[in-house]
Amino acid sequence: MGTHLHITAWVLGIILFFVAFALAGKNDKGAKIVHMIVRLLYLIIIATGVELYVRTGMKIPGFGGEYIGKMILGILVIGFMEMTLVRKKKGKSVTGVLIGFIIFAIVTILLGLRLPIGFHIF
């Protein structure tokens, strides 16, 4: 159940991130609301990730470092998401942080799929 909640929160977070990205920069009440929902999803993503690690990740020998690395990468992804939205809202260049978000998101997702708790695609 925890894995599904975590992945659902990530999928919703990424979808709403792109909605907020499209709305950012406009003085629109909807843009602020979507951005706040994305921030709430950040907290849910972090909470479910920590819960997954505490409940099962700590008990799997040989993967502790990879789980810690995935948590750090996940927090970096969230940081890049937030920096992208804030920079876009302020009218600054978002190319670098958007590329960073995409790279870190891909690496984090691939690492998550490789680890034993996630879905086993590899």
From Swiss-Prot:
Question: Pfam families per the record?
Answer: DUF1516
Q: Answer yes or no on keyword Cell inner membrane.
A: no
* Organism (species): Bacillus pumilus (strain SAFR-032)
Task: State the UniProt keywords alphabetically.
Answer: Cell membrane, Membrane, Transmembrane, Transmembrane helix
* Cellular compartments annotated: Cell membrane
**Protein family:** Belongs to the UPF0344 family.
List the protein's name: UPF0344 protein BPUM_1008
Q: Which residues form a coiled coil?
A: none
Q: What membrane topology term does the record carry?
A: Multi-pass membrane protein
Cellular-component GO terms for this entry: plasma membrane
Domain of life where this protein originates:
Bacteria
Kindly list the residue ranges recorded as spanning the membrane: 5-25, 33-53, 60-80, 93-113
